[in-house]
Structures are given as structure tokens and as C-alpha cells.
């Protein structure tokens, strides 16, 4: 038993690899002992095999060498078991048994049972290192492609376009690293349509510009990859990965997935993995970038150019607002802007929108007002009104304006021009009822003669015919380019005049046919006794101030004998004193001969020297007349063919031979053309 242990310990001892060696059974060449187990570990250098041969074998014979035996073991597997006797097979060779193994390690185990009836001497064996052809001597081929043997080893090599993996045995294709950036392309497995290489991992990358989504197209007949095994596992496979999406792995004869794969990404990774076997042709696919769409509407109330059913990445459109709408950015408005479909599927300038044009707060008008509008945007309507009853609108339909597409308030008749409130002429707020003469007549109110203008020095009168114009007699303003004038007061008291409107003169325009004379007292020719005074500022109309109408040129405005007209003024009375309260009266028109027959009161003039023309009207009756201080005031007649009382200036107080009798009035109808032309040529106030 101790002997068994001793030999076992010796057998487990390992030494450095050697090129050759000798193995002898215990006690050789004497009889080997019973109950012995001994092991020899043989190791030659890497890259060599072992040639083992026996020159002597003499052991107990038994069935299957069950009693005594020599075992040859490689990698735990019994290669051979020997027992019995052997003799040389060749007379020239001492070898009785020999073996050659392609491995560089072997175990030889000697075993004897508990008794031997005969004397057996055991065995003698020798081993040596021999070169191995690894490329042919093994069942498993060591190289995937080309195997190259040399003494003590071998090396593997690969065909062109292949490379040797780190295991130095298998070849693969260098098919990774390709990056595709074109919007349209085709990708195929290596060697397609020839069989693809084994033991390879091909990685392809598609990297498109942001704003495109990758779409793959694969025909079934363009896909041939080693089918899955019985458990459904793909040893060769094609896989697609796009951000958070994965498609595959796919394998088989004919593409098993959808023929069109639409990703939501502009990047895609393709992985084609193969194992060591297979003779399939591989695959081919096509891809293209599908541009990301943008919503069709950026801003309502707009027109797009060009018009398309679908807008996609990089499309540029011109967006034009429809009439009445505009794009407002800051304080600047425009009717159009450009927008580009961006890579994120959103339009540039999406913050801009077509908003209704805002016409803004309507401008105020003189002597009128505009109602507060509910809104001031496109389509809104406003109404202007004049300050009634003292003003009226020049155009009957001129009060309604709508907010137009161009951002202006527009009237159907006037366009963008603002309405004008024209003073109502010839309508007193209180009709004159007392029929008393001025010369010694009764007082009246300014409301009955709102057109009456008071000239302070020399005292005289005038007629307001427009907010900028006063009509008077030429001799009232002769030699006075800046007369002091008031309107709106009945009394000439200082405190009352303070509350009246003082009129500031812009210019005095005397009729060009009026003959200038230095001394009024000696004047006998009052032909063309008419003048206009233009005012610097407009007169504000009201219950005490209003213009009188001008006559028209039709025959209806020809004064006729017997017509009753109104006169007013602050001239002297029969006791030859000037009054401070306005007086008025009704006077009939009479024939010019009646005025010619009046005895002259002026001691400096003869009756026959006075000039009478068709430019004059004679009016009055005994005791009813105008007098000094009334000059220039209006002789008012009712406007013909109107329902409500309205007056026009038929004449201007001009002169008379004697107060309290018949007086001469300048016939205004003869000067209407000159009046209108002069007013037009000097329209508006003079600006400082």
C-alpha cells in the first residue's frame, strides 16, 4: 500500500516540456509488483505532437485488459489500452507497438492487480516530439480560411478585403465605418449578390440633415440571410436602430419585415452579424430622406405663395394678408412676410400673424364730433356729426366712415378726406317779430340777427357770411386795414363786448371798382360800395353767431319792389345819438327814383351830384331807415322757395341823402361772382 502511494506521488510530478524521453514499468526488466498504479505526464513543446513507441511489452493478458494494463490518455479521453505480449513486426526494428498523437500532452498509466500467477516483466517505451500539421491533422480546421503549417506551429491568413480577427484564426470582412449622408442611396451586404462573408459584423451609418426622416425600402427577393434555427434564433441577422426605435433582427429567405420602414429619425444604424457558416447571398436595401412636413396654416386670413397641398422642410412661402389684415411687428405694419419650414417641423416667423388692420382713433373735426367707436379695426364703422343746429355736414352722406383695408377711415363719397361742418346760414335762433324802424326803432336781440358784425371805429356794421369772412361796405373799411370787430353781442357795453368774440383781421379786400376818396362827407359816388374782410381765425358759431347766406345768381334772387327786408345795427337814432343796444326793423324795397327824389342833407354835396346805378337797391319808407353807424350791415331778404325762415344778404347799408327816409343798399347779387372768387383765391387763414 505504501508502495502504491509512493509511485502515485512520483507520477504526479511535472517537469518542463522535453523533446524526448523514456518510460519503463516498475522494476523493469524484473517482474513488476502487484497492486501498482503509476502515471507519467508527457509534455513536449507547443506546436509539436508526440510519437510514442514500445520496444518491449510483457503483461498479464485479460479481456479488455481488465487486470493489468497500460493506458494512453489525452485530454481525459482514453486513446489506447495495452496488455499481453507483443513482438516486433519487422526484423529490423525493435518496436513492438507505436502511436502518434497530434497533441503535445499525454498521460501514460500503468496498472497491476493484486496477483499474477506468472512472472511478467512489464514494458519499455520511448517518446519523441514530432512536427504536427495542424492544418490537416485535426478534425476541426484551425483556420476559417487559409491554414499555413510550419515546424512547431501554424498560422492563419485571409483572402483580399478580409482581415484576421484577434483570435488569429478567423477572418472577417472590414465592412464597418461607412457613413451615408446623401438623401437617396442604396446599401448592400458585402459581395452581394454573391455569398456574404462569415464571422463578420458590418456596421453602417446613415446620417441625414435634420429635417428629414429616413425611409427604408426592401424587396423580398433582395433578402437572403441564413434562416433562424428551430428555436427562432437568427445566427446571421440584419438589425436597424433609429434613436428610440429598433427594427429586427431579421433573417430568412425573403425579407420577413415590412417592405417599407418609416422611421421618425434622421439617423439610422444598420448592423449585419454573421456566424462561421452559411452560403446565402445577403441583402440589398434602398433608403431616402422624407422631409418633415410643416402645418399648412401659419396665420389665418392670409394667402400663401406658392400654394401647395403639402409643405415640407426647406419650403419657403410668402404669406400675404388678405385685404383688411396686416402683420404687426413692433410699431411697424406690413402686408406680407416670408416663412421657412424648419427642421423641427415648425415655420419660422410663426409668431407673426395677420391681424385686422387698425385704423386707430379717428381724427376730430372742427365744429363736429365722432361717436366713440366700439372698435377701430378693419370693417368697423364710425359716424361723424356736426354741432347742430349751427353747423351742417357739407356732404349729406359724409358722416359715415368705415375702417378700410389700407388702415384709413374712408367715406363712400369723400374717401379719406374728413367731413366738413359748414355753418348754417341765414337762420336766426329767435325770429325778429317787432316791426320797428332802426331810425328811432326798438331794440332787438342778437339772436334775431346773429350775422351782425360790429365795427368799432369808425362805427359801422358788417355781415358774417362765412367762418373766415365778413362782408361790409367799402367805405366802412376804406383806409383801415385792421378794423376792430365783434360778433355775438346785443349790447355794446364794455363788459358785454368782453364776452363777445373779437374778430382778428387777416386782410381787407375792397372791390377793385370802388373809387377811393379822402373825404367821405364829400363823396357822391358809392357805386361798388362793397368789401370783404378775411379773418385770421375761424368764428365759432352758436345761438348768437351765425353767417347769413349769399344770394344765388338765379332770377329768384332779384330784389323786387315791395319785398320786405330786415336791417339791424347800432347806428344813430332820430335824436342823432348812437345806441348801445342792437336795433332792427323791416323795410320795403322801393324804386330807385324814390331815393333820387330825397332832399340831400349833406351841405357839402348837391343832390344832382349823387350817382345811382344798377348796383344799388333803394329801400325804406318815411321814418323807417338806416343811418350813420349802420353802414355795412346786411339788408336781409327771405331765401325764396324754402319752408323754414331763412335769410340771405340782398344788400349792404351803403348811403342815403337823409336819415329816416329812403336809403341806398349795395346790391350784393351783382357781386356774388367776385365774392366767391375772392374767397376761393384766399381760402383758409394765413398761417404764421
Swiss-Prot record:
Glycans are attached at residues 174, 406. SUPFAM superfamilies: Complement control module/SCR domain, EGF/Laminin, Spermadhesin, CUB domain, Trypsin-like serine proteases. Residues 131-172 form the EGF-like domain. Ca(2+) 2 binds at residues 131-132, 134, 149-150, 153. Ca(2+) 3 binds at residues 226, 236, 275, 278-279. Disulfide bonds join 65-83, 135-147, 143-156, 158-171, 175-202, 234-251, 294-341, 321-354, 359-403, 386-421, 425-549, 595-618, 627-659. Its EC number is 3.4.21.42. InterPro entries: CUB_dom (IPR000859), EGF-like_Ca-bd_dom (IPR001881), EGF_Ca-bd_CS (IPR018097), Pept_S1A_C1r/C1S/mannan-bd (IPR024175), Peptidase_S1_PA (IPR009003), Peptidase_S1_PA_chymotrypsin (IPR043504), Peptidase_S1A (IPR001314), Sperma_CUB_dom_sf (IPR035914). Keywords: Calcium, Complement pathway, Disulfide bond, EGF-like domain, Glycoprotein, Hydrolase, Hydroxylation, Immunity, Innate immunity, Metal-binding, Protease, Repeat, Secreted, Serine protease, Signal, Sushi. One of its GO terms (molecular function) is identical protein binding. The modification (3R)-3-hydroxyasparagine is found at residue 149. The record marks 437-438 as: Cleavage. The active site is at 475 (charge relay system), 529 (charge relay system), 631 (charge relay system). It is found in: Secreted; Cell surface. Belongs to the peptidase S1 family. Core component of the complement C1 complex, a calcium-dependent complex composed of 1 molecule of the C1Q subcomplex, 2 molecules of C1R and 2 molecules of C1S. The C1Q subcomplex is composed 18 subunits: 3 chains of C1QA, C1QB, and C1QC trimerize to form 6 collagen-like triple helices connected to six globular ligand-recognition modules. This is Complement C1s subcomponent. The gene is C1s.
Amino acid at each position: 500500500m505504501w508502495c502504491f502511494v509512493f509511485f502515485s506521488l512520483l507520477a504526479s510530478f511535472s517537469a518542463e516540456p522535453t523533446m524526448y524521453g523514456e518510460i519503463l514499468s516498475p522494476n523493469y526488466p524484473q517482474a513488476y509488483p502487484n497492486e501498482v498504479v503509476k502515471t507519467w505526464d508527457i509534455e513536449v513543446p507547443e506546436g509539436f505532437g508526440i510519437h510514442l513507441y514500445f520496444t518491449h511489452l510483457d503483461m498479464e493478458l485479460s479481456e479488455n485488459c481488465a487486470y493489468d494494463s497500460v493506458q494512453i490518455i489525452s485530454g481525459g479521453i482514453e486513446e489506447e489500452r495495452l496488455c499481453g505480449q507483443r513482438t516486433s513486426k519487422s526484423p529490423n526494428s525493435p518496436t513492438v507497438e507505436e502511436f502518434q498523437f497530434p497533441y503535445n500532452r499525454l498521460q501514460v498509466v500503468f496498472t497491476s492487480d493484486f496477483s499474477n500467477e506468472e512472472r511478467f516483466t512489464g514494458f519499455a517505451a520511448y517518446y519523441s516530439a514530432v512536427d504536427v500539421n495542424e492544418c490537416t491533422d485535426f478534425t476541426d480546421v484551425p483556420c476559417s480560411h487559409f491554414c499555413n503549417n510550419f515546424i512547431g506551429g501554424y498560422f492563419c491568413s485571409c483572402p483580399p478585403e478580409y482581415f484576421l480577427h484577434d483570435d488569429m484564426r478567423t477572418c472577417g470582412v472590414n465592412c464597418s465605418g461607412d457613413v451615408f449622408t446623401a438623401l437617396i442611396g442604396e446599401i448592400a451586404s458585402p459581395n452581394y449578390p454573391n455569398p456574404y462573408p462569415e464571422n463578420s459584423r458590418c456596421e453602417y451609418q446613415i446620417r441625414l440633415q435634420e429635417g428629414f426622416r429616413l425611409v427604408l425600402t426592401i424587396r423580398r427577393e433582395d433578402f437572403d440571410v441564413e434562416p433562424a434555427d428551430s428555436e427562432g434564433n437568427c445566427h446571421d441577422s440584419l438589425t436597424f436602430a433609429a434613436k428610440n426605435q429598433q427594427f429586427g433582427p431579421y433573417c430568412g429567405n425573403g425579407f420577413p419585415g415590412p417592405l417599407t420602414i418609416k422611421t421618425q429619425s434622421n439617423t439610422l444604424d444598420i448592423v449585419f452579424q454573421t456566424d462561421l457558416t452559411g452560403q446565402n447571398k445577403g441583402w440589398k436595401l434602398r433608403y431616402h430622406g422624407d422631409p418633415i412636413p410643416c402645418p399648412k396654416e401659419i396665420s389665418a386670413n392670409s394667402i400663401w405663395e406658392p400654394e401647395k397641398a403639402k409643405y415640407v422642410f426647406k419650403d419657403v412661402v410668402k404669406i400675404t394678408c388678405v385685404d383688411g389684415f396686416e402683420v404687426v411687428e413692433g410699431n411697424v405694419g406690413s402686408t406680407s412676410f416670408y416663412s421657412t419650414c424648419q427642421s423641427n417641423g415648425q415655420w419660422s416667423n410663426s409668431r407673426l400673424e395677420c391681424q385686422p388692420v387698425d385704423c386707430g382713433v379717428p381724427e376730430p373735426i372742427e365744429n363736429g364730433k365722432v361717436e366713440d367707436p366700439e372698435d377701430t379695426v378693419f370693417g368697423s364703422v364710425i359716424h361723424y356729426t356736426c354741432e347742430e343746429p349751427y353747423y351742417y355736414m357739407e356732404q349729406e352722406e359724409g358722416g359715415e366712415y368705415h375702417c378700410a383695408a389700407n388702415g384709413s377711415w374712408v367715406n363712400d363719397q369723400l374717401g379719406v378726406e374728413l367731413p366738413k361742418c359748414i355753418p348754417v346760414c341765414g337762420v336766426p335762433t329767435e325770429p325778429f317779430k317787432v316791426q320797428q324802424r332802426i331810425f328811432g326803432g326798438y331794440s332787438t336781440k342778437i339772436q334775431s340777427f346773429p350775422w351782425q358784425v360790429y365795427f368799432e371805429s369808425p362805427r359801422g356794421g358788417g355781415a358774417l357770411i362765412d367762418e373766415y369772412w365778413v362782408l361790409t361796405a367799402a367805405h366802412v373799411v376804406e383806409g383801415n386795414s385792421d378794423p376792430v370787430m365783434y360778433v355775438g353781442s346785443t349790447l355794446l357795453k364794455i363788459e358785454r363786448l368782453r364776452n363777445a368774440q373779437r374778430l382778428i383781421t387777416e386782410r381787407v379786400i375792397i372791390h377793385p371798382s370802388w373809387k377811393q376818396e379822402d373825404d367821405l362827407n364829400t363823396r357822391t359816388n358809392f357805386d361798388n360800395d362793397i368789401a370783404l374782410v378775411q379773418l385770421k381765425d375761424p368764428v365759432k358759431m352758436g345761438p348768437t353767431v351765425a353767417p347769413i347766406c349769399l344770394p344765388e345768381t338765379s332770377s329768384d334772387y332779384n330784389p323786387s319792389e315791395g319785398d320786405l327786408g330786415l336791417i339791424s345795427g347800432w347806428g344813430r337814432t332820430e335824436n342823432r345819438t348812437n345806441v348801445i343796444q342792437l336795433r332792427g326793423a323791416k323795410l320795403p324795397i322801393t324804386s330807385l327814383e324814390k331815393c333820387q327824389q330825397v332832399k340831400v342833407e349833406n351841405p357839402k354835396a348837391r343832390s344832382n351830384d349823387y350817382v345811382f346805378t344798377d348796383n344799388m337797391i333803394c329801400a325804406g319808407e318815411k321814418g323807417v331807415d338806416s343811418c350813420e353807424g349802420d353802414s355795412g350791415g346786411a339788408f336781409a331778404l327771405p331765401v325764396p322757395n324754402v319752408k323754414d325762415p331763412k335769410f340771405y344778404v340782398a344788400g349792404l347799408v351803403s348811403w342815403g341823402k337823409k336819415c329816416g327816409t329812403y336809403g341806398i343798399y349795395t346790391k350784393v347779387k351783382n357781386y356774388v361772382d367776385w365774392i366767391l372768387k375772392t374767397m376761393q383765391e384766399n381760402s383758409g387763414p394765413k398761417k404764421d
